[in-house]
């Protein structure tokens, strides 16, 4: 849900339409993500998130985001148990991953999908660089972090070959294919501004990474 929300809040939801048209990519979302992004915001008194929820619902109605209701409960239980018993602080396990991320990972594993779209830092680092996450947690919590090597190894086995794509990377791919070409001579400036907007919308990306992105594009 994090990447969908980032792109929607940054008024960049048409990245999904563009990439689907240009590449034939499929964007599959599990039911828990629909619940978090659409159903919950539409059925609470606070209407602050209603506009974003309706835009996401429109993408589902248009077939751009395709909902998947597969029985991945067994895989979810295993991923949640393993993922939340890797790191310990003061002798207690740190609960790091939740229903949305767990279901998405389980669905990707079940359907043999190589990439997941995710802006949330903790789960991404848990997949890509768990020891970097350990250092981050130690600095954030100001305590020593212990590692359950058995759970860590199991998580690496469960997510082997799984790639994580952030909303910023989806934007850069779309940019390289002409998504922003209608801006003519300010196209690159718009791309950079959009990356900063995605960062402020919730994508876990550093200023250094944005600079590196912009150096790598024409």
Ranges and model annotations:
Residues 2-114, 121-218:
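Active-site-proximal, substrate-binding regions of enzyme catalytic domains
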């Amino acid at each position: 849900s994090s990447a969908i929300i980032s792109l929607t809040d940054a008024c960049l939801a048409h990245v999904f339409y563009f990439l689907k048209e240009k590449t034939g990519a499929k964007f599959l979302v599990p039911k828990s993500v629909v619940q978090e992004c659409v159903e919950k915001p539409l059925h609470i008194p606070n209407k602050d998130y209603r506009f974003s929820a309706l835009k996401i619902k429109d993408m589902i109605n248009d077939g751009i985001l395709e909902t998947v209701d597969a029985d991945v409960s067994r895989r979810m239980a295993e991923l949640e148990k393993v993922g939340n018993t890797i790191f310990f602080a003061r002798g207690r396990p740190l609960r790091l991953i939740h229903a949305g991320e767990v279901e998405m990972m389980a669905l990707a594993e079940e359907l043999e999908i190589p990439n997941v779209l995710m802006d949330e830092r903790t789960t991404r680092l848990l997949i890509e660089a768990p020891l970097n996450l350990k250092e981050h947690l130690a600095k954030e919590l100001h305590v020593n972090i212990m590692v359950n090597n058995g759970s860590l190894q199991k998580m690496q086995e469960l997510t082997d070959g799984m790639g994580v794509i952030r909303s910023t990377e989806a934007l850069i791919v779309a940019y390289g294919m002409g998504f922003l070409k209608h801006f003519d001579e300010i196209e690159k400036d718009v791309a950079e501004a959009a990356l900063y907007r995605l960062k402020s919308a919730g994508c876990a990306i550093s200023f250094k990474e944005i600079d590196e992105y912009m150096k790598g594009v024409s």
